[in-house]
């Protein structure tokens, strides 16, 4: 029997702002409570640090008001597979506006924590490789999904024929451009397959997981733009409805 080596990797470094729709609301609340308007980008233009505080306050209130209206609109429309083209266009337009609004508010922090994340994942990557090289089986006990980058890439570095099964209601297949919130823990599977080509995998020179060898099991809450990434890559998704319909055993057979 192969020895199991347990790797403790508890972290929440991938978190940027909390949750999907909640993330946008958090940014709004942060903006409302902020007295330093030059921390933000308003209407696409950086505010001068020495600009008039009264003018800044008016700009902030105006922007927040529009942003609040946008959030209210978002709660009135939800993406459904049976939407007609007009309804889908309306949803995508609102989602696009929300993405722009969030990134405008938080543009200076778009890739926050990258240095710490990369340092952590590189250590985890090397540890995973060492465990496998020693003939042991790595069992990772980790924090948020960002730890999957170091462990999965370390594994495929030692076994180039590996596939990856992602048990999650989320696909974690976002990219920087498609992520609404900027939560980096929504990118790991895209990084592991090199769909998201970013510095999150700079410590690894390949190989990456083949799209055809990547399977998502339990998907039920996938962003519309993220769905576009999944479909573009050709990654297989078994939804919660598929599990109910076919059963866990059959889904596992199909996944393998």
Predicted feature residues:
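Conserved alpha-helical scaffold segments that buttress catalytic/binding sites
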Residues: 2-6, 12-256
């Amino acid at each position: 029997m192969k020895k199991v080596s347990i790797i403790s990797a508890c972290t929440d470094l991938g978190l940027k702002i909390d949750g999907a729709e909640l993330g946008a609301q958090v940014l709004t609340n942060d903006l409302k409570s902020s007295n330093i308007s030059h921390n933000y980008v308003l209407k696409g233009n950086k505010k001068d640090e020495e600009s008039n505080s009264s003018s800044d306050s008016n700009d902030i209130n105006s922007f927040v008001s529009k942003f609040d209206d946008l959030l209210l609109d978002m709660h009135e429309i939800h993406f459904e597979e049976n939407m007609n083209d007009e309804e889908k266009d309306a949803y995508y337009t609102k989602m696009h506006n929300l993405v722009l609004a969030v990134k405008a508010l938080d543009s200076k922090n778009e890739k926050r924590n990258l240095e710490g994340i990369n340092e952590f994942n590189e250590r985890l990557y090397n540890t995973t490789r060492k465990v496998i090289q020693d003939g042991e089986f790595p069992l990772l006990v980790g924090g948020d999904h960002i730890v999957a980058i170091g462990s999965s890439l370390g594994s495929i570095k030692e076994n180039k024929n590996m596939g990856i099964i992602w048990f999650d209601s989320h696909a974690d297949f976002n990219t920087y451009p498609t992520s609404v919130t900027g939560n980096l823990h929504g990118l790991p599977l895209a990084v592991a397959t090199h769909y998201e080509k970013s510095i999150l995998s700079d410590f690894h020179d390949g190989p990456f997981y083949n799209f055809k060898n990547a399977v998502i099991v339990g998907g039920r809450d996938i962003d519309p733009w993220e769905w576009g990434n999944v479909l573009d890559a050709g990654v297989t998704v078994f939804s919660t409805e598929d599990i109910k319909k076919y059963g866990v055993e059959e889904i596992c057979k199909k996944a393998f």
